[in-house]
């Protein structure tokens, strides 16, 4: 557990004040960094960052390395999977369909911003097509698209 390791490292350092922000996903980490304000105290930044990471939902599209059943979903080796904060949100053989269904399952009326980070195995045109589909389906949300370049995860998506 990386958070446990960070807290152990914090306990070992005696000559510095260290605060661990317990993010569990890349989008939570990005949100924490965006909400850092240099003019605020460490305690104020910690409070703000912790509050904001609680508002982030994360989805990640990857592929199955073997046949399995998870969350009552039958998954075949090579299938695309949309993983959410609390389990599998979508499964299928078409990456973009799985990504869109994952986003649909992440959504509710409280979300205002959807950020899509596409990985090294997704071309820009494919990612833009997903963004366009999400924008059309959720016109009340701002939809951002960024090249993340990450391996393994075709898409990392945050909803805030």
Name these PLM-found stretches.
Residues 1-160:
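N-terminal loops that bind phosphate or other acidic moieties
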């Amino acid at each position: 557990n990386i958070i446990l390791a960070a807290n152990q490292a914090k306990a070992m350092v005696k000559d510095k004040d260290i605060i661990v922000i317990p993010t569990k996903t890349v989008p939570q980490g990005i949100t924490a960094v965006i909400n850092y304000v240099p003019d605020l105290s460490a305690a104020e930044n910690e409070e703000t960052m912790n509050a904001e990471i609680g508002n982030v939902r994360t989805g990640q599209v990857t592929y199955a390395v073997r046949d399995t059943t998870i969350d009552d979903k039958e998954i075949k080796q090579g299938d695309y999977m949309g993983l959410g904060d609390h389990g599998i949100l979508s499964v299928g053989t078409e990456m973009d369909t799985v990504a869109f269904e994952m986003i649909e399952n992440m959504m509710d009326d409280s979300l205002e911003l959807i950020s899509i980070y596409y990985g090294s195995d997704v071309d820009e045109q494919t990612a833009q097509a997903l963004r366009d589909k999400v924008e059309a389906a959720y016109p009340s949300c701002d939809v951002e698209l960024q090249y993340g370049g990450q391996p393994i995860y075709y898409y990392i998506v945050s909803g805030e």
